[in-house]
Amino acid sequence: MPKLILASTSPWRRALLEKLQISFECAAPEVDETPRSDESPRQLVLRLAQEKAQSLASRYPDHLIIGSDQVCVLDGEITGKPLTEENARLQLRKASGNIVTFYTGLALFNSANGHLQTEVEPFDVHFRHLSEAEIDNYVRKEHPLHCAGSFKSEGFGITLFERLEGRDPNTLVGLPLIALCQMLRREGKNPLMG
C-alpha cells in the first residue's frame, strides 16, 4: 500500500488531514505559484495543486501525494493575504455585504503508476454588512494578516458571515476532505479501513 504525502507546509492543511486518522508525512513542494496571464482562478488552483503533487514524485516514488491550492475571489479579482492591518480592513470593507468565492484545487498523484486525480471545489462565503467598528475590532482581535480574504472561518471570523455555501466545510480551510476521501478510495486507500 503506497504511503501518503501531503505536499504542503500549511499547519491548517496538516490539521485537516489528521482528521482522517491515517498516517502521512508533510513535504514542501517546490512550485512557482505565479499566476499565468490567461488563467482563471479555477485553472490556477488546479494547475498549482497538480504541480505541487507532481513536484515531489522523484523524492517519493511509490507514494500517494496530495497537492492543494486555494484562491479567494471577490468581484472577479483574486484576493491575496493582506499582510498588514490596513490591507485586512480594506479587504473586509470590500467583502462587506458581498459574496467571496474560494476555489480550492485538489490533486492526488500516485507516483508509482503516474495516475493523477484532480478536482476544483468552490465555496461561497456570504458576508453580512459590516460596520467600521466591527471590522476594526475583528482585525484587532483575530490578526488575520496571513489569511486570504482577511478572516479565519474556523475562528472568530464566523461572526462576519450571513451564510456559507459549499459541499465540504473543510474546503474553506484549504483541503476538501470529502473529495480527497473519494480519491483515496479509488486508489485502494479507504480511511475507514486503516
Swiss-Prot record:
Outcome of mutating residue 13 to A: Loss of activity
Which cofactor(s) does the record list? a divalent metal cation
Q: What is the effect of changing residue 52 to A?
A: Loss of activity
Q: Which SUPFAM superfamilies match?
A: ITPase-like
Its recorded reaction(s) are: N(7)-methyl-GTP + H2O = N(7)-methyl-GMP + diphosphate + H(+)
Name the GO cellular-component terms. cytoplasm
Q: Name one GO molecular function term.
A: nucleoside triphosphate diphosphatase activity
What does UniProt list as catalytic? 69 (proton acceptor)
Look up keyword Transferase and say if it applies: no
The record ties this protein, via NCBIfam families, to:
maf (TIGR00172)
Q: How does it assemble?
A: Monomer and homodimer.
User: Protein name, please?
Assistant: 7-methyl-GTP pyrophosphatase
Q: Which organism is it from?
A: Escherichia coli (strain K12)
